[in-house]
């Protein structure tokens, strides 16, 4: 019992020291970013969490991951534990490339990362970040996925608003509608584009398109029906779904019909099974859908 208490105290102290180190790092980063902003410059530095160089624009949304806290650590933990060298990662709604860069490092040059981001400001930073890290296995496209091939009007956010880029009306409570401009964007039907570009299998797909997720999934239905996508990491929000005329349950039922199990992404990237009667109580946040053939590999 004494031994257990001893190691418990050591672990507590170790965690406290780590938190203090993180706080010191974020404080130092805040000072560096303020200095860059005063000079009207962007900053190139290591982004905490993914530990890769990124262009840090003083006004971009993702500066919170540089100056305040590690952005979506649960998602990073899951990716770190499950994505392997040589595999394929598809990022729909890649923004400035936080996850695409992380996955490019993990899958190594033998793997493939495909990133789609329609927004002007976000895509420009995504392009810079790819060049900065010299990731030849990262393909970037200023376009989006949808239910069909078409050119649509897209709301592209200014610095600080880029995370709220959307095909729909800007309704997020943290977004300022006057900070967006409308630009024409090419949408591709996902299954068709992937077939044309010789993408036979996707080991992990991330989907975050501010409410348009259901339309993207409908355009990729064949890929899910044949379970050519092993895992899907998706942000589900009731409010954003309503803006596109559907309920999150529509996503859940569609993917279950295709043979996928539904999980909430918990602490340290652990998968927490969600049951049938949870459909009407979908919580905001990141969810994981895993093909039945992959279930036993992903619950640990």
Positions of PLM-derived features:
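Glycine-rich adenosyl-binding loop in Rossmann-like folds that engage adenosine-containing cofactors
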Residues: 52-76, 136, 141-197, 285-289, ...
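Conserved acidic-Pro-Pro-aromatic motif
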Residues: 192-299
């Amino acid at each position: 019992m004494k031994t257990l208490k001893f190691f418990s105290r050591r672990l507590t102290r170790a965690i406290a020291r780590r938190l203090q180190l993180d706080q010191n790092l974020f404080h130092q980063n805040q000072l560096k970013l303020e200095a860059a902003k005063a000079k009207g410059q962007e900053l190139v530095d290591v982004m905490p969490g993914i530990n890769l160089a990124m262009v840090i624009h003083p006004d971009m949304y993702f500066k919170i991951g540089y100056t305040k806290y590690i952005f979506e650590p649960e998602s990073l933990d899951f990716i770190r534990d499950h994505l392997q060298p040589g595999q394929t990662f598809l990022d729909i709604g890649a923004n400035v490339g936080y996850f695409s860069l992380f996955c490019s490092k993990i899958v190594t040059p033998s793997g493939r990362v495909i990133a789609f981001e329609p927004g002007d400001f976000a895509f420009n930073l995504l392009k810079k970040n790819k060049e900065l890290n010299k990731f030849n296995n990262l393909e970037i496209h200023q376009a989006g996925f949808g239910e069909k091939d078409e050119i649509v009007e897209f709301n592209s956010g200014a610095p600080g608003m880029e995370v709220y880029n959307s095909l729909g009306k800007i309704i997020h409570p943290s977004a300022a509608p006057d900070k967006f401009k409308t630009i024409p964007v090419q949408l591709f039907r996902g299954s068709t584009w992937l077939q044309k570009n010789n993408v036979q299998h996707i080991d992990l797909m991330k989907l975050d398109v501010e409410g348009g997720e259901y339309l993207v999934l409908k355009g990729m239905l064949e890929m899910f029906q044949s379970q050519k996508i092993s895992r899907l990491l998706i942000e589900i929000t009731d409010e954003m779904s309503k803006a596109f005329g559907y309920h999150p349950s529509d996503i859940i039922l569609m993917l279950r019909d295709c043979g996928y199990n539904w999980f909430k992404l918990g602490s340290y990237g652990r998968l927490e099974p969600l049951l049938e009667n949870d459909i009407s109580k979908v919580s905001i946040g990141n969810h994981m859908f895993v093909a039945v053939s992959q279930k036993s590999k992903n619950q640990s």
